[in-house]
Amino acid sequence: MTNDDIARAILDAGIYVVLATADVDGVPWASPVWFATENYRELYWVSYPGARYSQNIAVRPQIAMVVFDSTVPAGTGQGVYMTATAEQLSDPAAIEYGIGVFSRESVRQGNEGWGIEYSILDPDVPQDVRIGVRP
């Protein structure tokens, strides 16, 4: 099994990615978020705009991430470690694509599918935060 095969298997089995972000002063913050990926090069998650990591990404888009299985015995764990630049999705086609990625992943995990209605988080909040990640 190649390293790429191992990484893909970890991403396929993972439900959460741990995001490491920093605020404008460089103060770090790590948070697990449910993620979806379709092509192993772009990760998507939907975030509340007030979430600390969303606010951090708005001022400092450089992030680090790790996906791993925390249930395996000590000394046997494997993970996928990544650095990337995160960005809020604003293009309607990109948002629709990302929601589609989420829907397919949700169904794969035995949950309901997502529709475009999920792209409207809160009508009283001036902006939604949809984050796409590219290496």
Range-by-range predicted roles:
Residues 77-135:
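Charged, gly/pro-rich active-site loop segments
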Residues 7, 53-56, 94-98:
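Amphipathic alpha-helical interface surfaces
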Residues 1-16:
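Extreme N-terminal tail/first-helix region
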Residues 48-52, 102-104:
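Short, solvent-exposed aromatic-acidic interface loops
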Residues 53-89:
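Helix-adjacent hinge/juxtasegments
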Residues 21-23, 67-73, 108-118:
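A short, aromatic/hydrophobic, helix- or strand-capping loop or linear motif
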Residues 10-11, 56-57, 102, 133:
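A generic structural signal for nonpolar/aromatic side chains embedded in well-ordered alpha-helices
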Residues 14-49, 65-68, 78-81:
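Short beta-strand segments
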